[in-house]
């Protein structure tokens, strides 16, 4: 998950608050110290951290929660609102024909981001073309060409031409049928006069609709000064922060860049070409705190091609204990695409579930591998066995294991976990709070933020 360490610590703090018998001055002080430690570890500026926690303490001790809201939930609401202040305003990514120019230093992920951007717009129904205008970095042309092929985007480049302006103008003509044209420009090891002059010359000649600066999240707070320097020199319309999944400093990078008052358009959340998302401060913070991001959850379900009717049917079967192996197989098959399960888990309101634990990337990978093995096992079952797992005896287990090329123990483990899941659902059936969460996920999409008064 993006900012896994930060998220895990913040979710633990949320659980500490919601698990408190009451909120008094000592509790507020303790939570304040926890937040300071967590945010400083994430490389957020010291003064920013002090300002956040000071205001959080003041509000927690002076303000009274609305009628019907518990002090614990109101405390979470205050933390949410104070953290939201340092993440900037929502971006306005327009889904229309446009020309986008990417700028930034070497190694920050411009070329990969160009591919992810093209993939993003193509998923939204717009055709995309990539233009290789990095004339300095070795193999930049070949890398972007390979990326374009991997996402089925159009491509233009001229490895023999050393004038980026000529390349781009020719590229815009060749790719005139592409609705979104993305220009990958050269970088430098540091911001120098040559880089600034080249970017200015391209911008003046091409007049792109958007100039997006690509920043590496591993820079932490230092992302702020660098972003400001490039923005002051050439003027940018938005920012892409990359590698948010691989650093503990992402929180510092986000808060530092947000101070520029230039919107953060996208964040890179993984290695796959699908791992780029529009940066929405409210959605991002909700996921970070474990309050859920139901909009992303439903987008993920949509990506898996699960209809609302199918989701509702699965929910009803789960809650009535009628869920069988065939139903389980159908769901797993839809979420088998790489990265989709991770995206789903990150969107769930786990901090609201009593006794829930943080699910890390290694656990998700292990689960994906296990589910793949279980799908192979179920492929060796008859329709009757999938519909009625109770009939699977020792003889059938032996046959299924041989057909799937696995151990009999693996088949037994699948049946054991399926039975445990059904039993857990029966227990949860009487838990109205848990049922409310599940129903919200399948139906309304309003749980989490609405329940805390955050929307």
From Swiss-Prot:
GTP binds at residues 104-111, 184-188, 242-245. It is found in: Cytoplasm. It holds the Pfam family SRP54_N. It catalyses: GTP + H2O = GDP + phosphate + H(+). Its EC number is 3.6.5.4. GO terms for biological process: SRP-dependent cotranslational protein targeting to membrane. GO terms for cellular component: signal recognition particle. Coiled coil: none annotated. Part of the signal recognition particle protein translocation system, which is composed of SRP and FtsY. Archaeal SRP consists of a 7S RNA molecule of 300 nucleotides and two protein subunits: SRP54 and SRP19. This is Signal recognition particle 54 kDa protein.
């Amino acid at each position: 998950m993006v900012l896994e360490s930060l998220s895990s610590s913040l979710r633990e703090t949320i659980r500490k608050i919601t698990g408190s018998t009451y909120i008094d001055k000592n509790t507020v002080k303790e939570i304040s110290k926890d937040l300071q430690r967590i945010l400083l570890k994430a490389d957020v500026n010291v003064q920013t951290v002090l300002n956040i926690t000071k205001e959080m303490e003041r509000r927690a001790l002076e303000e009274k929660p609305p009628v019907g809201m518990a002090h614990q939930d109101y405390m979470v609401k205050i933390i949410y609102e104070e953290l939201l202040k340092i993440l900037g305003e929502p971006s306005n990514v327009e889904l229309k024909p446009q020309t986008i120019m990417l700028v930034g230093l070497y190694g920050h992920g411009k070329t990969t981001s160009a591919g992810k951007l093209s993939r993003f717009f193509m998923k939204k129904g717009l055709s995309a073309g990539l233009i290789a205008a990095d004339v300095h970095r070795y193999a930049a042309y070949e890398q972007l060409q390979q990326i374009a092929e991997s996402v089925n985007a159009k491509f233009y480049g001229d490895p023999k031409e050393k004038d980026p302006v000529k390349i781009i103008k020719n590229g815009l003509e060749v790719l005139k049928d592409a609705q979104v044209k993305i220009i990958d420009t050269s970088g430098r090891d540091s911001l120098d006069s040559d880089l600034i002059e080249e970017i200015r010359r391209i911008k003046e000649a091409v007049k792109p609709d958007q100039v997006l600066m690509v920043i590496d999240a591993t820079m932490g707070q230092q992302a702020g000064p660098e972003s400001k320097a490039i923005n002051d020199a050439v003027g940018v319309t938005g920012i892409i922060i990359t590698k948010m999944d691989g650093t503990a400093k992402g929180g510092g990078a986000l808060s530092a860049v947000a101070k520029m008052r230039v919107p953060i358009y996208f964040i890179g959340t993984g290695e796959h070409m699908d791992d780029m998302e529009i940066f929405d401060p409210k959605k991002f913070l909700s996921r970070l705190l474990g309050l859920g991001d139901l909009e992303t959850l439903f987008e993920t379900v949509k990506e898996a091609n699960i209809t609302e009717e199918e989701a509702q049917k699965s929910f009803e079967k789960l809650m009535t204990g009628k869920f069988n192996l065939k139903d389980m197989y159908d769901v797993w098959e839809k979420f088998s695409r790489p990265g989709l399960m991770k995206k789903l888990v990150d969107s769930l309101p786990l901090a609201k579930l009593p006794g829930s634990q943080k699910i890390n990337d290694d656990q998700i990978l292990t689960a994906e591998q296990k589910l793949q093995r279980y799908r192979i096992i179920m492929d060796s079952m008859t329709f009757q066995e999938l519909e009625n797992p109770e009939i699977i005896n020792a003889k059938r287990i032996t046959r299924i294991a041989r057909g799937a090329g696995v151990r009999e123990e693996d088949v037994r483990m699948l049946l054991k976990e399926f039975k445990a899941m059904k039993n857990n659902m029966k227990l949860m059936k009487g838990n109205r709070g848990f049922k409310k969460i599940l129903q919200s996920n399948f139906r309304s999409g309003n749980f989490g933020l609405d329940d805390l008064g955050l929307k």
